[in-house]
Amino acid sequence: MKLLVFALCVVFEIGGVHAQTPDWQPSAGHTQIPIWPSTAPDAGPIAGPEVTTTVQDPGDPPATFVGRVSRPSMTVYSPKGTNTGAAVVVFPGGGYWVLFMDLEGTEVCDWLTSKGITCVLLKYRVPGENRFPRSGAYPKSPVALEDAQRTVGLVRFHAAEWGVDPHKIGVLGFSAGGHLVAAVSTNFKRRLYKAVDAADRESCRPDFGVALYPGHMMENTSRQFELNPYVPVTKETPPMFLLQAEDDPIDPVKNSLVYYYALKRAGVPVEMHLYAQGGHGFGLRPTTFPITGWPQLVETWLRTIGMIPK
């Protein structure tokens, strides 16, 4: 994914920059909602102020990413047409360094809301100095996972207000966001932070998960084909949908495979789709490969598991 490489160059101030602005803002009519009432837990050093950058590869539409996020927020997009009662929290990818807010965020929300699904776009913390998760003094707990746990609980807390069925709240993520899907789907019995309000009394277990070209699934292990211990799959892990291309140059397809086998061993319902070609970081944007039809597969799967009407 050339855009990710370029994004890292921007974060570390090496290479050209296109249309850089101070911070990301959603489209008119939508408002970012801070997910923490005050300072986020486990706040640590950041590389600098939040910055939003728009880049474009020749022949491709532009993509916007945000880096150095230290103040996480969510943006709620209401369903269009008939409300199915389902909600999806979307985690953009970007290697835990940046977040591709349109390619793997707002464009996904446009699709979900067109299907009658409430979309909650999470701008989770990517301070710009650490990957997720790693050993050492900082972060003591993975800040992105804290943000994900908090947001799932918030959606459940506001379910009646937002027209959401509290038993139909899922998560969907790309690349590093796909790893975050796996992390929050397997780390829900205990929050990694002290409760701050009534929303933290709600369950932070998603009812389903969709991980698209996930990465980081084999970190923190010395074996060649072993699941990251920070993704402790059990029979209580929610149903999962996995999709990846075998020619993915950023996150090898074994990231999906190792998670798939762990889910199967635990007896968790899982559907996986692998494609010979497709690369990495395509989001919903059309390509010349069959993998571009993945939204229809996810929609069918959601109907199959009873999250949206058949």
Locations of regions flagged by a protein language model:
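Primarily recognizes the serine-hydrolase "nucleophile elbow" in alpha/beta-hydrolase
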Residues: E146-K235
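C-terminal catalytic histidine-bearing segment of alpha/beta-hydrolase fold enzymes
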Residues: L257-K310
